Amino acid sequence: MDTLSNTIDIDIQHPEEWRLSLRIDEKCVSFTAHSDVERESFLFRKVELDGGANDFLRPLENCIYDNPFFLLDFKQVKVALHSMRYIIIPSDMAADTELAERAFVTMYGAIGGNLIIDQMKGCGAAIVFEAANGVLPFLNRTFNNPPVRHHLSAICEYFAKKCEATDADRQYVYLHDNRADVTMFRNGRFAFANSFECHSAADTVFFALDAWNEYELDALNDELQIAGDKAAREEVVPMLKKYITYVMPAIFPAAAMKIGQDAMKAPLDLILMSLCE
């Protein structure tokens, strides 16, 4: 499965049978698509954006309009936005929009774009995050008001599901795109999530251990489960094992096999988005 920089070679005859999941950041649009009818239809690609942090909307518009594939009449479109301007607050607090907005402003001083409140199932928490100015209206116009979530939500919900029947203290580390997404669970309950930019394996180890120590997990008895980029995992795991006894791979969602063998090669968060109805 090649990760191409465009969508020219993708030929879909019946888009009304297909589901599209997009993860959008300042550098690229990563996406998966699969058919509810065709076997082994799953595909994963990335399309680079010609722009940067200070000019995000126009490159995104160009990317979508330059790739007619994105404008097909899909059965379903879902979007995850990468945003580092976010807070995580209790679900009941997030249910009050005014209160959620005040909490965000307390953290960041002002709202510079569109604020989105993303309730996470099974976590007892919500991510309140900012979409860059103009991005949310563009997505709503182009994809007919798709669900737009934070890039951390899918993995938080998935790992929360894995912990719900336990009283485990556990850390999950998901490696992708030079990032480490770290989630923490205490007594089987969601406690913390953050996304860290990592320029080296040492960065990943530092952020993982910092969260581990902050939440006082036991290095001899508690688990650290790791997912994501294979090469990054192979470099990081031996380093983590110097400090934590139980470092093991996170369980891959078995349901992903139903949408195609290539699903195993796609990023975990996009797979999880693809599996959710």
List each model region and its residues.
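Hydrophobic/aromatic-enriched cytosolic interaction surfaces used to assemble or bind macromolecules
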Residues: 1-277
